[in-house]
Amino acid sequence: MMENYKHTTVLLDEAVNGLNIRPDGIYIDGTFGRGGHSRLILSQLGEEGRLLAIDRDPQAIAVAKTIDDPRFSIIHGPFSALGEYVAERDLIGKIDGILLDLGVSSPQLDDAERGFSFMRDGPLDMRMDPTRGQSAAEWLQTAEEADIAWVLKTYGEERFAKRIARAIVERNREQPMTRTKELAEVVAVATPVKDKFKHPATRTFQAVRIWVNSELEEIEQALKSSLNVLAPGGRLSIISFHSLEDRIVKRFMRENSRGPQVPAGLPMTEEQLKKLGGRQLRALGKLMPGEEEVAENPRARSSVLRIAERTNA
């Protein structure tokens, strides 16, 4: 079934170019998806190069297993655990680049059975790994109204969060929702002011998906681990699709691109300054898709690519 879904990789060349591939380097594709980035990385690696790919979606793992290449290996799990995967392979401090393509993929959105989209009726699931954790339906049926409202406000930036949360709880009390269409209809009715350019359920579906998959915590943990696993000169190449993701990536790169914060006039010896350490990253800027790419793939419109390099500090 998954073969029916065409996936166009956003900022493909730019993200891989951002890694500054060395033929004998060791790289991580933390979000394999349908393998667009991985295949391009492999095409630039020599015989001694290695690529470790990660994904928690069983369908992505099935696609990855069709790649018959001794330089390539796939791990079924969350990219937040990349530090553990690298340590298990005795590669701490030896990784030359990490690529992350954040958020939900087009095949996940387009497959109604995954439950990510309000445009297609399917089971109210939304899990990137359907074998683990609570589905969206299970969480919405058991969560408190205040908790649902908080999630909608925090992860969906939904201004009618309280009103929608109340409607969800009332509907589940009458008859538990199990379908995406049911949730979309409840949200539409509960939303007093409609945006003519956006479906009223857009923010709710984003928020519930982020919560169910712990997406922002996943990003924060992966970024934290990256400093430990990257070799000096190793690159981070990260694509975000909405402001919540990009804010985390931008803040991480900014904070780790600064040197030690020492109050002006505080007397310190050279030895003391060395112990404080220097900046750990050098931010190399950001890129956004061009008009041609957006025209071919409208989902690329909100994407942002940020690149940074590990320093010797």
UniProtKB/Swiss-Prot annotation:
It catalyses: cytidine(1402) in 16S rRNA + S-adenosyl-L-methionine = N(4)-methylcytidine(1402) in 16S rRNA + S-adenosyl-L-homocysteine + H(+). Its main location: cytoplasm. GO terms for cellular component: cytoplasm. InterPro entries: RsmH, SAM-dep_MeTrfase_MraW_recog, SAM-dependent_MTases_sf. It comes from the Bacteria. S-adenosyl-L-methionine binds at residues 35-37, 55, 79, 101, 108. Its EC number is 2.1.1.199. The keyword DNA damage does not apply. One of its GO terms (molecular function) is rRNA (cytosine-N4-)-methyltransferase activity. Keywords: Cytoplasm, Methyltransferase, rRNA processing, S-adenosyl-L-methionine, Transferase. GO terms for biological process: rRNA base methylation. It is found in: Cytoplasm. It holds the Pfam family Methyltransf_5. Belongs to the methyltransferase superfamily. RsmH family. Specifically methylates the N4 position of cytidine in position 1402 (C1402) of 16S rRNA. HAMAP family: 16SrRNA_methyltr_H. This is Ribosomal RNA small subunit methyltransferase H.
